[in-house]
Amino acid sequence: MQTIFAQATARGKAGVAIIRISGPDAFEVGRCLLGSLPDAGRFALRDVRTPLGELLDRGLVLVFKAPASFTGEDTVELQLHGSVAVVRAVEGAIRSTGLARLADAGEFTQRALLNDMLDLTQVEGLGRLIDSETEAQRKVAQASFEGGLSDKAERWRHLMIRAAALLEASIDFVDEDVPVDVVPEVQSILMGLDTDLAKEVTGAVVAERLHDGFEVAILGAPNAGKSTLLNVLADREIAITSDVPGTTRDVIEARLDVSGLPVTFLDTAGIRDTVDVIEKIGVQRAIDRALAADVRILLEIDDWILPDVLSDTIDFRYRAKADLSDGEGISGRTGVGIDRLLTDIEGVLSEKMSAVRSAVTDRQRGGIEAARVSLDAGVTVLSGTAELELAAEHIRHAQRSLDSVIGRVDVENLLGEIFSRFCIGK
């Protein structure tokens, strides 16, 4: 395997830049540039020179001996001054040794996977951790990166192996006097697994919303103050406000951090019967987005009736334009009621978040759901004809589905897509 190198910190001018070198010739590359290396696990200040002796920079050098490194390979890290020119010169010097090439996107992490330093769920958790923008996203992604889903998957896998082994033993000794009926125990194992997997799937749906951002739809009649409220929440003018009803035609979005949760507020068209074709399209879009949203808030005004299709979906109702009435309700102009609004939204979303255990991706959820389908089929067989061979085959199918989640089998075609989302130095 070739030795690779890349800048591990962001490109551009900065205080410090880190260049990582990993692979069988990493130490030799380091000696070409530094003369000598500190002992593994130690750091030292060194002059960085070209193979011909030209001084390029002076910085800290860290050495990691395989397998005690991120990639599981011999690794050298150079902490340099973050000048674009310095980084370019040092990378050129590394390349000139002929011992290393520039890494592909995500190649360091890919090597960590291939060297069993990480499994596939941890790799995907790392990707989510890098992408995290809010505290809730960070915590959930960190749980995946630390192996939260991996540990559960291993436990489920061992239970499946035990259930299949019990059935196989009964099949092998079918003509002998086997004193114990294993079917009740196997059924108990499978039903317990089904409960665990169902909880994980439920949490996965919310985890995906956490990654993409929860949606909160602001609904109401035309000129109810929805756009004004959105502008106040976003702390900038992103929606046009006017006394003319029907100003908002399309859905306007503002992404915010609400107590560590990523939330996209949706300013929707005022809902009313209209003969205006364009406004009618806007009203339908408002209804469609509201039905798909995680939370729906309604700004109420007198003499206006919410359409039946939305009447049972509203999470919170607030009196609109409180600045023009007795002060009860909510007002985008004065800020009355906005703290209560945010607290209400946080409460609903925090309750949804209680089902999330780790940053489960769509791919992982698909594998878990497939495993659950196979387990349910096994339970059905055992409850009916009790054909042990068929039930055992369903369990083996479930195990293969679970193995694909953590990267034991059938993942080669996924690696290119997964690692292409990483930066060059990761």
UniProtKB/Swiss-Prot annotation:
Domain (TrmE-type G): residue spans on this chain: 213-350
Amino acids binding K(+): 223, 242, 244, 247
Main localization (coarse): cytoplasm
Domain of life: Bacteria
Entry EC no(s): 3.6.-.-
Family annotation (CDD domains): trmE, TrmE_N
Record bears the keyword Nucleotide-binding: yes
Subcellular location: Cytoplasm
Pfam families associated with the record: MMR_HSR1, MnmE_helical, TrmE_N
Signal peptide positions on this chain: none
Positions that bind GTP: 223-228, 242-248, 267-270
Binding-site residues for (6S)-5-formyl-5,6,7,8-tetrahydrofolate, renumbered to this chain: 20, 77, 117, 426
Keywords: Cytoplasm, GTP-binding, Hydrolase, Magnesium, Metal-binding, Nucleotide-binding, Potassium, tRNA processing
UniProt function note: Exhibits a very high intrinsic GTPase hydrolysis rate. Involved in the addition of a carboxymethylaminomethyl (cmnm) group at the wobble position (U34) of certain tRNAs, forming tRNA-cmnm(5)s(2)U34.
Subunit architecture: Homodimer. Heterotetramer of two MnmE and two MnmG subunits.
Family note: Belongs to the TRAFAC class TrmE-Era-EngA-EngB-Septin-like GTPase superfamily. TrmE GTPase family.
PANTHER family: TRNA MODIFICATION GTPASE GTPBP3, TRNA MODIFICATION GTPASE GTPBP3, MITOCHONDRIAL
Name of this chain's protein: tRNA modification GTPase MnmE
Native source organism of the sequence: Jannaschia sp. (strain CCS1)
Gene (UniProt): mnmE
